[in-house]
Amino acid sequence: NTANAVKEGTKEYEYFQECMKDLAEQLQKLQDANVPIILRPLHEAQGNEGNYSDGTSWFWWGDRGAEVYKELWKLLYTTLTEEYGLHNIIWEYNSYNYANSDTWYPGDDYVDIVAYDKYNCDFNRDDGQSSGTPNLSAISPIFNYLYELTSGKKMVAMAENDSIPSEENMVIENAGWLYFCPWYGDHLMSS
């Protein structure tokens, strides 16, 4: 039960504390070497929300809803920054369903970058597979929604994606994505 991970005295809380300690040890090595890192923890928390028999999402950190998720995020943030003194971290909140991102957003004080995962190549073969035809749209409605979510205070990234929007479409649609991270080899190696 994820709700127990934010309750002191529970085995889930103790386990999460150990996980954060292990993570902090590794991040400390990077801080000692003056290496900044974009950390995208607890990503896609609302992924597939409500589509399982118990109404939960596909990752454990989202399985008890937005309020518990935000508590978990803030616990992670506070522990790493205040208890362990890690200040080389750029915190990235990664939405899955942008339509309800505001419900899950941990808040401007705990986030540096907002991000979205885009998988929307054209699936137009009879077998349901991608034809390889990339969707070059800049998906500006999603970009604009995430930009407005933070009142323009945060940069907006495409943290996972298949095809990359065309430069022309990003200019036309005024969608200034901070970066892209193609997730599959097909999209890394194709034009």
Model region roles, listed by residue range:
Residues 126-162, 191:
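P-loop/Walker A phosphate-binding loop and immediately adjacent motor/lid segment at beta-alpha junctions
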Residues 40-43, 73-100, 153-164:
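Aromatic-lined carbohydrate-recognition surfaces of secreted/lumenal glycan-active proteins
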Residues 153-191:
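Substrate-binding cleft of secreted/luminal carbohydrate-active enzymes
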Residues 1-82, 86:
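Substrate-binding cleft of extracellular glycoside hydrolase catalytic domains
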Residues 25, 94-106, 137-145, 162-171:
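Alpha-helical scaffolding within the catalytic cores
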